[in-house]
């Protein structure tokens, strides 16, 4: 009987329940609750469910005491040196193998490949000036970098230059880009930045309208824009090729993101590779999304997530997103003045690369002022320009701080 009781005690002591009673064990419980809350947002509120659901579940898995789902000590350093490979291959598990795709920068470009197969650049081609709105919205990224450096200077928090740059990229409202930059510059902040980036992407309809209305007048919001011209198939085919060449020559570090985005779009527009275009936009993208979100979720351990830095990252992420929206709207107002009132400033807010949510918000706010107004296609120009802009901004940050 004594042996039986000792066996039961031994089983309990080796279980995860016993570890909740250890010093700091309550942190695991907090992280599990955070994961469950994100699952609630994904399932009930439908906030970016394709990403948040596997990410939140990965967060729960990684914070179950004793589970040993991922071993982040194998990934210390800037690259994967020979001893790390040996440790990962011999002692690593599923999450370790999947995380190698994040560490090596494989998943985000493949996500961009899938995005490219679903992106329509015709509104941008027919109105090239909308590229400026997409570029203007990226000012939020660089403004937030300065904000992070200012916070560090005041002593409130200690962010390095690389960490500040990784946080700033949240302002691009592009999850894969944020993960790509963070994995290169500040992998220790990957979980916090990924959660913030995708949360704010889901909150586009909540965050943007108050900023848009505060910076524009009723007259400006009521502007009806002329119908866009029809774009030929030749233009749609040449565009991704030329963008890849020009952007890669100007910002070589953006070549992999922009190149994969444009390859996906070329597959879509050329019309001769339907089979691989559908695979890249459906099966491949779905598989990579699962791998990416699950592995990123597994990096959110209690000791790296539950600290004041995460709180500042969330605040700075909101500032970055708000700055990007405001910069786009203000540049839209400038174009409104220069065009003699022919450009609706609301389309400037779509310069952040949350496709197509930001464009839909421009449409909704515009129709609330003028029910006969249809801004969606006009807003899609800055929206897809924002995707290119965020990739270019990522390349610039990696070039400077990488």
Please name every model-derived segment.
Residues 244-328:
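Transmembrane helical segments that form the transport core of multi-pass membrane transport proteins
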Residues 61, 99-125, 264-267, 285-307:
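Hydrophobic transmembrane alpha-helices of secondary-active transporters
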Residues 188-206, 316-324, 347:
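Alpha-helical transmembrane segments
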Residues 100-104, 112-118, 133-143, 147, ...:
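Alpha-helical membrane segments and immediately flanking helix-loop junctions
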Residues 123-145, 301-328, 379-383:
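Entry/N-cap segments of selected transmembrane alpha helices
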């Amino acid at each position: 009987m004594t042996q039986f009781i000792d066996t039961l005690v031994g089983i309990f002591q080796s279980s995860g329940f016993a570890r909740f009673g250890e010093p700091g064990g309550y942190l695991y419980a907090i992280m599990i609750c955070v994961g469950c809350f994100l699952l609630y947002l994904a399932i009930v509120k439908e906030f970016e469910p394709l990403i948040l659901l596997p990410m939140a579940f990965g967060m729960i898995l990684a914070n179950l005491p004793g589970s040993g789902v991922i071993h982040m000590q194998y990934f210390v350093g800037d690259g994967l040196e020979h001893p790390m490979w040996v440790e990962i291959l011999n002692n690593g598990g599923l999450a370790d193998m999947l995380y190698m795709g994040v560490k090596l920068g494989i998943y985000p470009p493949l996500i961009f490949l899938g995005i490219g197969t679903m992106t329509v650049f015709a509104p941008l081609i027919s109105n090239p000036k909308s590229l400026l709105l997409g570029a203007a919205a990226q000012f939020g990224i660089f403004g937030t970098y300065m904000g992070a450096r200012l916070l560090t200077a005041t002593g409130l928090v200690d962010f390095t230059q690389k960490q500040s740059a990784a946080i700033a990229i949240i302002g691009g409202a592009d999850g894969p880009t944020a993960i790509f930059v963070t994995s290169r510059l500040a992998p220790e902040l990957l979980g916090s930045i990924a959660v913030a980036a995708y949360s704010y992407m889901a909150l586009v309809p909540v965050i943007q309208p108050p900023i848009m209305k505060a910076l524009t007048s009723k007259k400006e919001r009521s502007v009806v824009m002329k119908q866009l011209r029809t774009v030929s198939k030749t233009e749609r085919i040449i565009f991704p090729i030329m963008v890849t060449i020009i952007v890669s020559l100007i910002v070589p570090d953006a070549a992999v993101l922009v190149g994969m985005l444009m390859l996906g779009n070329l597959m879509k527009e050329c019309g001769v590779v339907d089979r691989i275009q559908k695979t890249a936009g459906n099966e491949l993208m779905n598989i990579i999304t699962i791998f990416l979100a699950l592995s990123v979720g597994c990096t959110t351990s209690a000791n790296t997530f539950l600290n004041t830095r995460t709180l500042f990252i969330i605040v700075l992420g909101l500032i970055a997103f708000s700055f990007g929206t405001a910069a786009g709207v203000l540049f839209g107002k400038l174009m409104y003045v220069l065009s003699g009132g022919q450009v609706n400033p609301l389309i400037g807010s779509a310069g952040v690369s949350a496709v197509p949510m930001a464009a839909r918000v421009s449409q909704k706010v515009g129709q609330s002022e003028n029910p006969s107004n249809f801004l969606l296609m006009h807003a899609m120009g800055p929206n897809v320009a924002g995707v290119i802009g965020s990739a270019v901004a990522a390349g610039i940050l990696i070039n400077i701080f990488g």
